[in-house]
Amino acid sequence: MTNNDAAVEAPSSSRASSSKQQPKLEITEKVRVLCLHGYRQDGDAFKNKLGSFRKFTSKYAEFVFISAPHIAAPLESAAEPVPEQRSWWANKDDGTFKGTNKGGPAFGFQDSLRLVEEAWKTQGPFQGLLGFSQGACFVGLICGLAKKKLTSIRPEFAVLSSGFVSGSLVHMSAYEEPVSIPTLHIYGSSDEIIPKDMSALLASHFKNVEVLEHGGGHYFPATAQQKQTYINFFQDRLQEYLEHLELQQSSSVSFIESGAEDNDDDGDANDAEVAAATAAAGSDLDDSD
């Protein structure tokens, strides 16, 4: 929760029992987004890289960054691993990862999925996911798994920058059903690490898609050219979230009022039963005289 959180109390019902208290719904004034970094990054590095982006959208969204559980294999076999260089999974037999690799394994993927599920549960609530490169690939997989109810994560929207479809065979089933949540797909026309066609292919697996293509390479753009797109996207997501909470609150109030009416009906029935019993008793007394 942010410091801007506010509690909204449901309107009281004159028919509700005084012993019953109306529920309180906490309205989060910003949507909360769990962020997944790229290969050989970590949560802190990714957070720093998204400084301008976070500033653009700070009115509407709060971003939480976590780090992958695996240390990436060193670039050279004789080199020492760098703790700050993290990996969500490896898709090559030598323990490294390459986005363009096809048909390889997914070493460590389940560990990473459990970590993200735990973060979603313990650091939430969250409404959305955001990822860059391998992290965006991961976000796409999570959305597909959520569609099939194969993960406890339930994103309401997602942002995928320089994303791609995983080539690992064990991931193929995650792309079997199109995903309907709103998504923003960001990619560069000059990206040589993840060519834009790969990112466009990932976008094709979603139904409610907005695409932001920039003229650069493999990075998350955050200049004045992209600012309004980001603001509009998160403004819409916040509006949807608040409307959902308003509907939820309305349903809760209706449920309580319905319960109060049932109690009143029960009371009326009891009164009728008492009156009938009293009348019957009086009749018996008259007969005995």
Curated annotation (Swiss-Prot):
It comes from the Eukaryota. InterPro entries: AB_hydrolase_fold, FSH-like_dom, LovG. Residues 259-271 have a biased composition (Acidic residues). The keyword Transferase does not apply. Coiled coil: none annotated. One of its GO terms (cellular component) is cytoplasm. Keywords: Hydrolase. GO terms for biological process: response to retinoic acid. Belongs to the LovG family. This is Esterase GA18864. It comes from Drosophila pseudoobscura pseudoobscura (Fruit fly). The lineage of its organism: Eukaryota, Metazoa, Ecdysozoa, Arthropoda, Hexapoda.
